Amino acid sequence: PGPAGGGSVALLPMSQSNGSEPVTEPLTVADVVALLQAAAPPGLAEDWDSNGLICGDPAEPVRTVLLAVDPLTAVVDEAIGRGVDMVITHHPLYLRGTDHVAATDPKGRCVHRLIRAGIALANAHTSLDAAHGGVAAALAARLGLLGARPLSPSRLDPAQGIGRIGELEHPVRLRDLAVAVAAALPDSAPGLLVGGDPDATVETVAVSGGAGDSLLAAAREAGADVFLTADLRHHPATDHLEGGRPHLLCGTHWATEWVGLPPLAARLEAAAGERGRRLEAYVSEVVTDPWTLRLSTGS
């Protein structure tokens, strides 16, 4: 096994067609889950988290997968419309557990619709946040950060962990960095918020996709000039800014985590190909942020 519980992936060998051209057996749901967990080792996940197969038969074949941030109705609609065999989301369907999957609420209806359509559902949450090439690494890459390293290293593998911190190629004004970050993130109605002096010079940048309140102190201790994250609440943000740097860039939860999906799709396709299999991975562009319109307030 590799670091943080990443093990080898055992797949069935290729079969032969009439002794001539090789014909590959399709991957199974279990195979794709194994590839996913090789890319995002479960050992990197937080103790409170939920990762892995949510519904579906592990033995069913998989030729196409759809990657998305949230397992919501719109994503299920897209999966059924595309006719994919499996959906992989970043967020779990039942993070806090459940005592039923009856089709009496939206989550239960999603489960029933997926099962009726023969579509499996799996997820990789904080394991993907922390992994090499995961959400935080993708954010750092989009900003061109040099020497990116974990902001909060994993106990199991310090080379991986939640968040990343690195340096820009050269110092810039905060407002100019904000413009570049806004262009690097997928479009969503709330856009990007800036906290701090827009004309301040910044060079060391910390990033963490999704809710980042818990990493404000870590970003400061690491010497970041600016911290890009999402879901910053009023009191933690104002208390933090009262204490000085890092300045804050606050995107949306969906936008800051969506950036991890295209690299994951490429890794899954490549990993299947290395094993003589074919897998088509699509990335959903359905915006699952809850906010659909932003209006400026005041006169």
Predicted regions and their residues:
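Hydrophobic structural segments
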Residues: 7-299
